[in-house]
Amino acid sequence: MSALRLRNANTPAPELDELSDQTPSESRVLKRQMSMSQRAMSNTLTSAANLSNLLPTGTLLAFQLLTPVFTSNGVCDHATRFLTAVLLFLLAASCFVSSFTDSVKADDGTIYFGFVTFKGMWVVDYPDPSGLGLPDLAKYRMRFVDWIHATLSVLVFGAVALRDKYITDCFYPSPEAETKHVLDIVPVGVGVMCSLLFMVFPARRHGIGYLVTGSVDRR
Protein backbone atom coordinates (compact mmCIF):
# COMPACT_ATOMS: atom_id res chain seq x y z
CA MET A 1 0.00 0.00 0.00
CA SER A 2 2.81 2.35 0.85
CA ALA A 3 4.51 1.38 -2.41
CA LEU A 4 1.36 2.35 -4.35
CA ARG A 5 1.23 5.68 -2.56
CA LEU A 6 4.86 6.32 -3.36
CA ARG A 7 4.28 5.36 -6.98
CA ASN A 8 1.25 7.62 -7.26
CA ALA A 9 3.09 10.45 -5.56
CA ASN A 10 6.14 10.13 -7.76
CA THR A 11 4.37 9.60 -11.08
CA PRO A 12 2.96 13.12 -11.68
CA ALA A 13 6.20 14.83 -10.77
CA PRO A 14 7.89 14.42 -14.19
CA GLU A 15 4.71 15.64 -15.91
CA LEU A 16 4.67 18.78 -13.78
CA ASP A 17 8.33 19.30 -14.54
CA GLU A 18 7.67 18.90 -18.25
CA LEU A 19 4.76 21.33 -18.06
CA SER A 20 6.88 23.80 -16.16
CA ASP A 21 9.57 23.42 -18.81
CA GLN A 22 7.13 23.85 -21.70
CA THR A 23 5.01 26.66 -20.30
CA PRO A 24 7.60 29.47 -20.61
CA SER A 25 8.35 28.64 -24.25
CA GLU A 26 4.69 28.35 -25.11
CA SER A 27 3.93 31.59 -23.32
CA ARG A 28 6.70 33.31 -25.24
CA VAL A 29 5.24 32.04 -28.50
CA LEU A 30 1.78 33.22 -27.48
CA LYS A 31 3.12 36.62 -26.46
CA ARG A 32 4.98 36.88 -29.77
CA GLN A 33 1.83 35.99 -31.69
CA MET A 34 -0.20 38.48 -29.66
CA SER A 35 2.33 41.23 -30.28
CA MET A 36 2.30 40.48 -34.01
CA SER A 37 -1.49 40.55 -34.02
CA GLN A 38 -1.51 43.83 -32.10
CA ARG A 39 0.95 45.36 -34.55
CA ALA A 40 -1.14 44.15 -37.47
CA MET A 41 -4.28 45.61 -35.90
CA SER A 42 -2.48 48.90 -35.25
CA ASN A 43 -1.31 49.04 -38.86
CA THR A 44 -4.83 48.26 -40.02
CA LEU A 45 -6.32 51.07 -37.93
CA THR A 46 -3.63 53.45 -39.14
CA SER A 47 -4.30 52.55 -42.75
CA ALA A 48 -8.03 53.00 -42.17
CA ALA A 49 -7.39 56.44 -40.70
CA ASN A 50 -5.23 57.36 -43.69
CA LEU A 51 -7.89 56.07 -46.07
CA SER A 52 -10.48 58.34 -44.50
CA ASN A 53 -8.35 61.31 -45.55
CA LEU A 54 -9.02 60.38 -49.18
CA LEU A 55 -12.77 60.86 -48.73
CA PRO A 56 -14.79 64.09 -48.66
CA THR A 57 -15.03 65.34 -45.10
CA GLY A 58 -18.76 65.97 -45.35
CA THR A 59 -19.45 62.45 -46.59
CA LEU A 60 -17.25 60.94 -43.91
CA LEU A 61 -18.90 63.02 -41.19
CA ALA A 62 -22.36 62.02 -42.41
CA PHE A 63 -21.29 58.38 -42.38
CA GLN A 64 -20.02 58.59 -38.81
CA LEU A 65 -23.13 60.41 -37.57
CA LEU A 66 -25.85 58.53 -39.45
CA THR A 67 -24.53 54.97 -39.32
CA PRO A 68 -25.35 54.37 -35.63
CA VAL A 69 -28.83 55.83 -36.16
CA PHE A 70 -29.71 53.90 -39.32
CA THR A 71 -28.32 50.60 -38.03
CA SER A 72 -29.76 50.96 -34.50
CA ASN A 73 -26.23 50.53 -33.18
CA GLY A 74 -25.69 47.43 -35.30
CA VAL A 75 -28.96 45.65 -34.47
CA CYS A 76 -30.86 45.70 -37.78
CA ASP A 77 -34.14 44.31 -38.99
CA HIS A 78 -35.26 44.17 -42.64
CA ALA A 79 -36.36 47.81 -42.70
CA THR A 80 -33.25 49.28 -41.08
CA ARG A 81 -31.01 47.04 -43.20
CA PHE A 82 -32.67 48.37 -46.35
CA LEU A 83 -32.38 51.97 -45.16
CA THR A 84 -28.73 51.42 -44.28
CA ALA A 85 -28.07 50.06 -47.77
CA VAL A 86 -29.72 53.15 -49.27
CA LEU A 87 -27.60 55.38 -47.03
CA LEU A 88 -24.40 53.63 -48.10
CA PHE A 89 -25.39 53.94 -51.76
CA LEU A 90 -26.04 57.68 -51.41
CA LEU A 91 -22.77 58.26 -49.56
CA ALA A 92 -20.85 56.26 -52.16
CA ALA A 93 -22.53 58.32 -54.89
CA SER A 94 -21.48 61.46 -53.02
CA CYS A 95 -17.86 60.29 -53.06
CA PHE A 96 -18.14 59.58 -56.79
CA VAL A 97 -19.67 62.96 -57.66
CA SER A 98 -17.27 64.89 -55.41
CA SER A 99 -14.39 63.65 -57.54
CA PHE A 100 -15.76 65.73 -60.41
CA THR A 101 -15.83 68.98 -58.44
CA ASP A 102 -13.10 71.57 -58.21
CA SER A 103 -12.41 75.04 -56.90
CA VAL A 104 -11.13 78.17 -58.60
CA LYS A 105 -9.86 81.48 -57.25
CA ALA A 106 -11.25 84.67 -58.72
CA ASP A 107 -9.31 87.88 -59.20
CA ASP A 108 -10.60 89.24 -55.89
CA GLY A 109 -9.20 86.21 -54.03
CA THR A 110 -12.56 84.54 -53.44
CA ILE A 111 -12.67 80.78 -53.94
CA TYR A 112 -15.61 79.35 -55.87
CA PHE A 113 -16.61 75.74 -56.33
CA GLY A 114 -18.04 74.05 -59.38
CA PHE A 115 -18.39 70.89 -61.42
CA VAL A 116 -15.90 69.88 -64.09
CA THR A 117 -17.22 69.09 -67.57
CA PHE A 118 -15.69 67.89 -70.82
CA LYS A 119 -15.41 71.52 -71.96
CA GLY A 120 -14.21 73.14 -68.76
CA MET A 121 -15.70 73.95 -65.40
CA TRP A 122 -19.18 75.05 -64.41
CA VAL A 123 -18.88 77.43 -61.45
CA VAL A 124 -22.07 77.18 -59.46
CA ASP A 125 -22.14 80.27 -57.26
CA TYR A 126 -20.21 82.85 -59.31
CA PRO A 127 -22.28 86.07 -59.53
CA ASP A 128 -21.24 87.04 -63.07
CA PRO A 129 -22.60 84.56 -65.66
CA SER A 130 -20.01 85.72 -68.20
CA GLY A 131 -17.21 84.45 -65.97
CA LEU A 132 -15.39 87.78 -65.92
CA GLY A 133 -12.69 87.75 -63.26
CA LEU A 134 -12.11 84.00 -63.40
CA PRO A 135 -9.11 82.20 -64.91
CA ASP A 136 -9.42 80.12 -68.06
CA LEU A 137 -11.99 77.50 -67.05
CA ALA A 138 -11.12 75.30 -70.03
CA LYS A 139 -7.99 74.23 -68.16
CA TYR A 140 -10.20 72.63 -65.52
CA ARG A 141 -11.95 70.28 -67.94
CA MET A 142 -12.68 66.68 -67.08
CA ARG A 143 -9.87 64.19 -67.59
CA PHE A 144 -9.55 60.42 -67.55
CA VAL A 145 -7.77 60.52 -64.20
CA ASP A 146 -10.92 62.00 -62.68
CA TRP A 147 -12.78 58.78 -63.44
CA ILE A 148 -9.97 56.83 -61.80
CA HIS A 149 -10.21 58.99 -58.69
CA ALA A 150 -14.00 58.63 -58.61
CA THR A 151 -13.77 54.84 -58.80
CA LEU A 152 -11.05 54.72 -56.16
CA SER A 153 -13.07 56.98 -53.87
CA VAL A 154 -16.02 54.59 -54.02
CA LEU A 155 -13.73 51.63 -53.30
CA VAL A 156 -12.12 53.47 -50.39
CA PHE A 157 -15.54 54.29 -48.98
CA GLY A 158 -16.51 50.63 -49.28
CA ALA A 159 -13.35 49.61 -47.44
CA VAL A 160 -14.02 52.10 -44.65
CA ALA A 161 -17.65 50.98 -44.41
CA LEU A 162 -16.69 47.31 -44.14
CA ARG A 163 -14.34 48.16 -41.27
CA ASP A 164 -17.20 49.80 -39.36
CA LYS A 165 -18.60 47.64 -36.56
CA TYR A 166 -22.16 48.89 -36.97
CA ILE A 167 -22.19 48.01 -40.67
CA THR A 168 -20.77 44.54 -40.21
CA ASP A 169 -23.08 43.81 -37.29
CA CYS A 170 -26.04 45.00 -39.35
CA PHE A 171 -25.40 42.99 -42.52
CA TYR A 172 -23.47 40.10 -40.95
CA PRO A 173 -24.78 39.65 -37.40
CA SER A 174 -23.48 36.07 -37.11
CA PRO A 175 -20.86 35.61 -39.81
CA GLU A 176 -19.28 32.26 -40.53
CA ALA A 177 -15.56 31.82 -40.14
CA GLU A 178 -14.89 32.23 -43.86
CA THR A 179 -17.12 35.30 -44.10
CA LYS A 180 -15.43 36.90 -41.11
CA HIS A 181 -12.05 36.12 -42.64
CA VAL A 182 -13.08 37.79 -45.89
CA LEU A 183 -14.42 40.84 -44.03
CA ASP A 184 -11.08 41.18 -42.28
CA ILE A 185 -8.94 40.79 -45.40
CA VAL A 186 -10.81 42.44 -48.27
CA PRO A 187 -11.07 46.00 -46.82
CA VAL A 188 -7.39 46.03 -45.95
CA GLY A 189 -6.39 44.73 -49.39
CA VAL A 190 -8.64 47.21 -51.17
CA GLY A 191 -7.36 50.03 -48.98
CA VAL A 192 -3.72 49.23 -49.70
CA MET A 193 -4.31 48.96 -53.44
CA CYS A 194 -6.27 52.22 -53.52
CA SER A 195 -3.57 54.00 -51.52
CA LEU A 196 -0.93 52.84 -54.01
CA LEU A 197 -3.06 53.93 -56.96
CA PHE A 198 -3.64 57.33 -55.36
CA MET A 199 0.14 57.66 -55.12
CA VAL A 200 0.50 56.79 -58.80
CA PHE A 201 -2.40 59.06 -59.80
CA PRO A 202 -2.32 61.88 -57.23
CA ALA A 203 -5.40 64.06 -56.86
CA ARG A 204 -4.80 67.64 -57.97
CA ARG A 205 -8.31 68.94 -57.60
CA HIS A 206 -9.67 70.63 -54.50
CA GLY A 207 -13.34 69.89 -54.85
CA ILE A 208 -16.33 70.12 -52.56
CA GLY A 209 -15.53 68.48 -49.25
CA TYR A 210 -11.78 68.33 -49.81
CA LEU A 211 -9.05 70.51 -48.36
CA VAL A 212 -8.43 73.73 -50.25
CA THR A 213 -4.86 74.99 -50.14
CA GLY A 214 -3.67 78.48 -50.77
CA SER A 215 -2.63 77.81 -54.39
CA VAL A 216 -5.82 76.86 -56.17
CA ASP A 217 -4.66 77.86 -59.66
CA ARG A 218 -2.30 74.94 -60.07
CA ARG A 219 -2.68 74.12 -63.76
Swiss-Prot record:
Please list where the region (Disordered) is annotated: 1-24
The UniProt entry lists the main location of this chain as endoplasmic reticulum
Q: Which residues cross the membrane?
A: 51-71, 82-102, 142-162, 182-202
Top-level taxon: Eukaryota
Record's keyword terms, sorted: Endoplasmic reticulum, Membrane, Transmembrane, Transmembrane helix
A GO CC term assigned to this protein in UniProt: endoplasmic reticulum
What compartments host this protein? Endoplasmic reticulum membrane
The yes or no answer to whether the keyword Transmembrane is present is: yes
Question: What this chain does, per the record?
Answer: Involved in membrane remodeling.
Name recorded for this polypeptide: Protein DMP5
Tell me the organism. Arabidopsis thaliana (Mouse-ear cress)
